[in-house]
Amino acid sequence: AALCLPKDKDVLIITKENTDECDSMLAQGGVCVLKDVNDFKCYFEDTMKAGHWENDPDSVRVMIESSQEVIGTLIDLGVDFDTDKDGKYDYTREGAHRRNRILHHKDETGKEITDTLLDIAKKKENITIVPKTTMIDFIEKDNVCQGIVCEDEYGEMGSILARDIILATGGLGGLFLNSTNYPHITGDSFALAIKHGVELKDINYIQIHPTTLYSKKNGRRFLISESVRGEGAILLNENGERFTDELQPRDVVTNAIVEEMKKFGTDHVYITLPTMTTEQAAKRFPNIFDACMEEGYDITKDKVPVTPAQHYMMGGIKTDLYGRTSMAHLYAAGET
């Protein structure tokens, strides 16, 4: 958003921790895009079905129709998406998609996008970034947002007044015992929205990701991206049996895993990637491959223990198609 605003607008971005400690940096799989107009109907149906047809169809339509323009902008800004041996963009597949329509940068797509945009933002004279600063309240009168109250890393509090405020504070994974999110992502915007009467929507819709690297320790879980299953990985139960279609929507796969864990009295199942060689997996999924190897597993040959964990906030602050909330001059974007 900051990069899209006119240069004569002063923009202040505050982050709760350092700029590289955000969930966008952790996103692995990729970004869905409408490859051609003939795919629209299939793409729309896949998205609506995955959302149990509770999605806002207008929002889904806008998301799909604008995807090519958004991806084009990212490419123009310097984001590097993987290509195949012929130099064409390499589209992968993930759960609930009937077709390959996901662009990616190895298994660190979020980091590639976020680093690229941050590097540009840091060079803009009209953009100031202040890390380790926490929003603790809205400043509002008569349902018009006028700014925020914040606290820095030393406990000093202050007010920031602005004509418009955009909330992009992520989800609430830090409130969970096990989550793929950073621990400081604690749903701050949702709490303040409730306090000030800003309308929320589907706040109880919290996504559990089926496959995170199993650990007996509590805290942030390492994600085994859905795109690994899109490239042929399979799930196995305690008996080494395949028990579900791995590319169903995440809630369906998670429920199937939970049933297997109940059946065998375990707290994990297994994933393995028989469709790739060690060299191929290390190139396509370098971070995932290394994380598994650190635990003693070659994902192409071994059964890697995985377990579900909280991943994404599906609901949040209700907005219109322009990101406007029920409070004037207050906007919300992304997972918020």
List PLM regions with ranges.
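Short beta-strand to alpha-helix junction loop
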Residues: 55-68, 100-119, 130, 179-187, ...
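Glycine-rich active-site loop/strand segments that organize a redox cofactor
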Residues: 32-63
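A glycine-rich dinucleotide-binding beta-alpha-beta segment and adjacent secondary-structure elements
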Residues: 130-131, 136-145, 150-151, 284-336
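An anion/pyrophosphate-binding glycine-rich loop and adjacent beta-alpha core
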Residues: 19, 192, 198-305
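Conserved redox-cofactor binding core of oxidoreductases
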Residues: 76-156, 161, 168, 212-215, ...
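Glycine-/small-residue-rich beta->alpha transition segments that form the dinucleotide
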Residues: 17, 162-164, 168-173, 297, ...
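Glycine-rich FAD pyrophosphate-binding loop
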Residues: 6-31, 35
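Short hydrophobic core segments
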Residues: 148, 159-170, 193, 240, ...
